[in-house]
Amino acid sequence: MAQQEVVEGFKFEQRHGKERVRVARVWKTRQGQHFIVEWRVGITLFSDCVNSYLRDDNSDIVATDTMKNTVYAKAKECSDILSAEEFAILLAKHFVSFYQKVTGAIVNIVEKPWERVTVDGQPHEHGFKLGSEKHTTEAIVQKSGSLQLTSGIEGLSVLKTTQSGFVNFIRDKYTALPDTRERMVATEVTALWRYSYESLYSLPQKPLYFTEKYQEVKKVLADTFFGPPKGGVYSPSVQNTLYLMAKATLNRFPDIAYVSLKLPNLHFIPVNISNQDGPIVKFEDDVYLPTDEPHGSIQASLSRLWSKL
C-alpha cells in the first residue's frame, strides 16, 4: 500500500501510526445483562506527509496521539455491541475519509478472551473470567473503499493422548527419532483466514457476523484436529492434520478465500528411567516429559484457485 517516492535522489517509503492502544468497552442491556470487550489496537496510516521527513513542516501529519484518542472516541460512539472486525473497519474507514492526506489505513486488533462465567448453572449478568485463545483481526482500507479483511486465532492449545504417529520419514546418520504409530500430539494453533469481501460496500449486514464466524471457524479447526468423540481420527503427521484443518475451513465457509495455519509440534517425550538394578520407570504410554523447547514448527497456507492471494 505504501507509495514509493523519489526524494533528493533516493527511493523513499513512509508510514506512521500508533501501537498497543488498549481499550475496553462495556454495553448494558435494559434487562441488566452486561457485555464487555477488551481490545489492543494498532493503527498504521499511509499519507502524503513527506514534508515532515524532509523539512520542519508537520502540517500534513495526523498525530499518533490523535489516533489514540480516536480509538476511545469511536468506542464511545458505538452504542451497539460490535465485533473486533467491525470496529477495525470502522476505525480504518474513519481515517481514510476524515483526513484528506490519508490514502490508506491498517487497523489490527487483538481481543482479550473475557468469557461470561456460570454460577449455579446460570450465566452471570456481569461476571467474566479470562479464557485462553485470542481473537485477532486486521482491516486494510483504502480511500477508494477497497478492503482486505483478515481474522485469526492465537494460542488455541489442543492435545490428543493417542491416535497419532509418525513413520517412514527420511533417515540418515543424524536421525535418532524412531518410527511410531502411537504417540501423544499437542500443538498451539495460530490461524489466519482472509475473507473474500473486497470493498466496504460488499460486507454482510448481519450484526456480529464476524464474531459468529470466528466461533464457527474455531470449532471446525478443533473438530478436524480431534475427530469424532468416539475413537477420534488418526493423524499420520502434523503436516497432514494441518492440511485437513485448512481444507475443512475452506470447504465449510465459502466467503473465506485463504487460510494460513501454524502448528508447532509440542513434544511429550516418553519417560524411561533405569539404573544398574533395572527399570525405575518403564514407559507404557503413560508417563511423559512435556517440553516445548525445542519444538517442531509446521506451517502452510491454502487458498482458492481464484483467490488473488
UniProtKB/Swiss-Prot annotation:
Give the binding site residues for urate: T64, D65, F166, R183, V238, Q239, N265
**What are the record keywords, sorted?**
Nodulation, Oxidoreductase, Peroxisome, Purine metabolism
- Identify the GO cellular component terms for this protein: peroxisome
Q: Which residues form the active site?
A: K18, T64, H267
What GO terms describe the biological role, i.e. biological process, of this protein? nodulation; purine nucleobase catabolic process; urate catabolic process
Q: GO molecular function terms here?
A: urate oxidase activity
Q: What is its EC number?
A: 1.7.3.3
Q: In which tissues is it expressed?
A: Expressed predominantly in the uninfected cells of the central tissue of the root nodule.
Compartments, record wording: Peroxisome
SUPFAM superfamilies named in the record: Tetrahydrobiopterin biosynthesis enzymes-like
| Assembly and binders | Homotetramer.
Q: NCBIfam families this protein is in? A: urate_oxi (TIGR03383)
Q: Which family does it belong to?
A: Belongs to the uricase family.
Entry-linked PANTHER family? URICASE
Per its database record, what is this protein's job? Catalyzes the oxidation of uric acid to 5-hydroxyisourate, which is further processed to form (S)-allantoin.
This chain belongs to the protein called Uricase-2 isozyme 1
